[in-house]
Amino acid sequence: MKEYKVYLERARSRQQDFLYPLLFREYIYGLAYSHNLNRSIFLENVGYDNKYSLLIVKRLITRMYQQNHLIISANDSNKNRFWGYNKNLDSQIISEGFAIVVEIPFLRQLSSSLEEAEILQSYKNLRSIHSIFPFLEDKFTYLNYVSDIRIPYPIHLEILVQILRYWVKDAPFFHLLRLFLYNFCNWNSFITTRKWISTFSKSNPRLFLFLHNFYVCEYESIFVFLRTKSSHLRFKSFSVFFERIFFYAKREHLEKVFYKDFSYPLTFFKDLNIHYVRYQGKCILASKNAPFWMNKWKHYFIHLWQCFFDVWSQPRMININPLSEHSFQLLGYFLNVRLNRSVVRSQMLQNTFLIEIVIQNLDIIVPIIPLIRSLANAKFCNILGEPISKPVWADSSDFDIIDRFLRICRNLSHYYNGSSKKKSLYRIKYILRLSCIKTLACKHKSTVRAFLKRSGSEELLQEFFTEEEEILSLIFPRDSSTLQRLHRNRIWYLDILFSNDLVHDE
């Protein structure tokens, strides 16, 4: 019990005070503006950079000093005159600064933990999203069951505020957070709609990503705690950690829930072969043990979401499937375990018998249908996968057109080169290659046959065939047999920090 008290005291020591005064500092908005100039490719342009200036910020801070109307309740936001004439611009600027401020204590916590563990340099080297696939190849081939779980989001925004309140202790700070959230949804509603999530994520993507990541991090911290302490964690200690905010109000309910499902006082089991992977809004839970243990973890997840986050999750929405019979999607790939059966004849003295050997291999396949649908939406082909020209690029020079297609082809080839079957990847490259030729022919007002005859098809298409070979030749010796073998095998590039937008198109 003493160990868990130390854990809770350490968590409470991370609480940060006095974040609200930082909103009155000009350099905070300068950081937000600098971030917008160097905006990540994940985020869309919110379209107010041309209206942002130091003069606007100074006037805004002056109004914030003169009118202390930020410290209000969400229900009074309609009566608040603080926003002035340009409510959208003022709200946008302050929310961007708010997103910078709210990240400060957690960035300090992350950097300190990395420095203490002396893994800062290795952390930088392991940021590649491809680094997860070698792990899956090593581990998943020995597992038997997998559960593909969609992480539910809180049905009410107050839950997010309450979770964050445990880590940051600044009342005006949370009044302002409620004000921002109230501007984008109906606070009195019991359900947070997907329409609101889409609107909020586009208006302030930095703050939205922070709130979402913090919610996921909070639930995963509890899951990791349960996982590491599962061998000796009793129900009483678990309930103390589980209900950090409203423990006494919910303890009786928790006991009824858990004792209803289990006929003995709850003791966590030791499962050394469970693996957890999260990607976007989904997580994958895989184990070598029987489905009984997977069902245990399934109920733990459901009770965790319901009792701690007040999120209702249907048990039937979490399916447990044999890994050899179920394929799942991860990082733009389709993954499944293929069983290779072979029969070996063995002889012992005068007796001869056959032994069946089953070897599991992890197949990582390019999702050809979603990619063709994405290429069709981008006007590179039709829905059947037949290449078409892209007239909107016809105003560019021939070099720019070829360079654009080559860049897309190189990125897709670079990302999907870890596929176990390259046939689908070659089809995507063929679509882009022929679409490039049709675009050039459209620009020169000629047919494809006449354009290739005039310009020379071998020189034009050579770059599409050789660009990946040139990349590999920089890493491995230029040997034809070596390069051919590499083209057939999986190659995971550890410099890929994001997946292409075509991967996520639906």
Swiss-Prot record:
It holds the Pfam family MatK_N. InterPro entries: Domain_X, Maturase_MatK, Maturase_MatK_N. One of its GO terms (molecular function) is RNA binding. Keywords: Chloroplast, mRNA processing, Plastid, RNA-binding, tRNA processing. The keyword Ubl conjugation does not apply. HAMAP family: MatK. Belongs to the intron maturase 2 family. MatK subfamily. This is Maturase K. It comes from Lathyrus sativus. The gene is matK.
